[in-house]
Amino acid sequence: MPGETEEPRSPEQQDQEGGPAAAADAASEELRPGAAAAPAAPAETASSRVLRGGRDRGRTAAAAAAAAAAVSRRRKAEYPRRRRSSPSNRPPDGPGHQPAAAKPPSPAQGKKSPRLQCIEKLTTDKDPKEEKEDDSVLPQEVSITTTRASRSWRSSSRTSISRLRDSENTRSSRSKTGSLQLVCKTEPITDQLDYDVPEEHQSPGGISSDEEEEEEEEMLISEEEIPFKDDPRDETYKPHLERETPKPRRKSGKVKEEKEKKEIKVEVEVEVKEEENEIREDEEPPRKRGRRRKDDKSPRLPKRRKKPPIQYVRCEMEGCGTVLAHPRYLQHHIKYQHLLKKKYVCPHPSCGRLFRLQKQLLRHAKHHTDQRDYICEYCARAFKSSHNLAVHRMIHTGEKPLQCEICGFTCRQKASLNWHMKKHDADSFYQFSCNICGKKFEKKDSVVAHKAKSHPEVLIAEALAANAGALITSTDILGTNPEPLTQPADGQGLPLLPEPLGNSTAGECLLLEAEGMSKSYCSGTERVSLMADGKIFVGSGSSGGTEGLVMNSDILGATTEVLIEDTDSTGP
């Protein structure tokens, strides 16, 4: 059955199978160097070995080798890759097979093994021509006669012995026979060839079973395949030549279109990268991360911080109302503007301002000097700080980065935005209003200045109506030595000095009627001013003297909270 090993058979069974098989088995047993072989005979001379019938020994060895090779090939064809027994157990093929007559061995041959005799004969009697022929044929016989490597459970010594025996037998037989080219150069077809086994190799009936098992193992070893060994030093092995090249598949039109699109994208990306590289060549290379070396003399770049998103908040501290772009800025503002004490004083004699931080003091100290290191590249105007230059540059560029989130008002400076944001919260910031036009102001003094500038007639009329009117011609307008007022008569204005109108002409003084309407004005420049004692002066001043009306602010009635400042004071 396939896959099963054949058990060794006894000598009696071998005799029953046939005499020719026993003869082949005996021939192979005679050639095998066993462990129980007879010891070698004493050394003989070369002439005695030649006279012992070298030609017959050569024929015997050649016949044995041919029989073994024939049986091995036949079994390979019938049962591929199976464990098979020795060729001695199978009968020879062909009905006309006649074994050759066996020659009785001589006494000298019984003393020495046939293998040693063949070796000695070849070494002594071989011609130079035969040696050259054997050397040329040797590479071809190796592929036929080399035995296969043993498995792990078989002995390696037996494998080497069988290889040596087969190679020596084929050499000796080919040197004596004329069929050298047929055996070595071409491999015969097993189905068309008949092999003859000589009769001289018939084994006697007394072969032990142990010897038969050893012979069977040797034949199995010779028939097995050589296992693969990966030798890294083998330069002739080229695995890429053994592989079958896959057939190229036909590419569809879609694949070509996708490839064309990819090529276009790659070309566009390459062009963009080239443009970026050209732009970056002008710029300085980016600084590498890590610690700064001691020998690095390049200027230190400021640390970049990401700006937080804009979230306008207002400072709720009393009297502040500053608008900031993020709650984090608000915390910083409250800490350094309201909680931290001002301990840095400006050393300038005419200043004396206080600051919370030293850098604020250093920035302020530049204003007391005439040093202007920051120059505008558009108009060549110089500034004392880089911040002032940056704000000024926005005038040329038209940039207004700050914007009111309520009405969209844009400006360049944060102070302008803070001033603008107060308009949207008029109830808290503009608590003082004009009672004539209703305009609101942040300070009370701004209302008084507004009335004196925008509504002077109404202010004078209200003042004279409340005071019943009086003509002032005193030179002491500051009230340091006030003259007593005389009572009015017949609804006319009363002079402060005796005979004030005697030497005065029409149009040189102010005369008010009882209704509070003026008839004429004194010559000179009219003005309304607040004196030191809280009185109001309305009149004209000249180099010769000053004339006008002096009124108490307590008699103004509804406008008692209004304080009138000099018209030179700044207003909105």
UniProtKB/Swiss-Prot annotation:
This is E3 ubiquitin-protein ligase ZFP91. GO terms for molecular function: ubiquitin-protein transferase activity; zinc ion binding. Its EC number is 2.3.2.27. Belongs to the krueppel C2H2-type zinc-finger protein family. It catalyses: S-ubiquitinyl-[E2 ubiquitin-conjugating enzyme]-L-cysteine + [acceptor protein]-L-lysine = [E2 ubiquitin-conjugating enzyme]-L-cysteine + N(6)-ubiquitinyl-[acceptor protein]-L-lysine. Interacts with MAP3K14/NIK. Found in all the examined tissues including brain, heart, kidney, lung, liver, spleen, thymus, skeletal muscle, ovary and testis. PANTHER family: E3 UBIQUITIN-PROTEIN LIGASE ZFP91 (PTHR46179:SF11), ZINC FINGER PROTEIN (PTHR46179). Residues 209-225, 272-284 have a biased composition (Acidic residues). The modification Phosphoserine is found at S86, S106. GO terms for cellular component: nucleolus; nucleoplasm. InterPro entries: Zinc_finger_trans_reg (IPR051061), Znf_C2H2_sf (IPR036236), Znf_C2H2_type (IPR013087). In contrast to other E3 ubiquitin-protein ligase, does not contain any domain (RING-type zinc finger or HECT domain) known to mediate E3 ligase activity. The gene is Zfp91. GO terms for biological process: activation of NF-kappaB-inducing kinase activity; protein K63-linked ubiquitination. Residues 61-70, 143-162 have a biased composition (Low complexity). It comes from Mus musculus (Mouse). A zinc finger (C2H2-type) spans 313-338, 344-368, 374-396, 402-424, 432-455. Residues 72-85 have a biased composition (Basic residues). Residues 340-370 are annotated as: Interaction with MAP3K14/NIK. It is an enzyme of class 2 (transferase). Residues 1-308 are annotated as: Disordered. Residues 1-12, 122-131, 226-247, 254-271 have a biased composition (Basic and acidic residues). Atypical E3 ubiquitin-protein ligase that mediates 'Lys-63'-linked ubiquitination of MAP3K14/NIK, leading to stabilize and activate MAP3K14/NIK. It thereby acts as an activator of the non-canonical NF-kappa-B2/NFKB2 pathway. May also play an important role in cell proliferation and/or anti-apoptosis. The lineage of its organism: Eukaryota, Metazoa, Chordata, Craniata, Vertebrata. It comes from the Eukaryota. PROSITE patterns: ZINC_FINGER_C2H2_1, ZINC_FINGER_C2H2_2. Pathway: Protein modification; protein ubiquitination. It is found in: Nucleus.
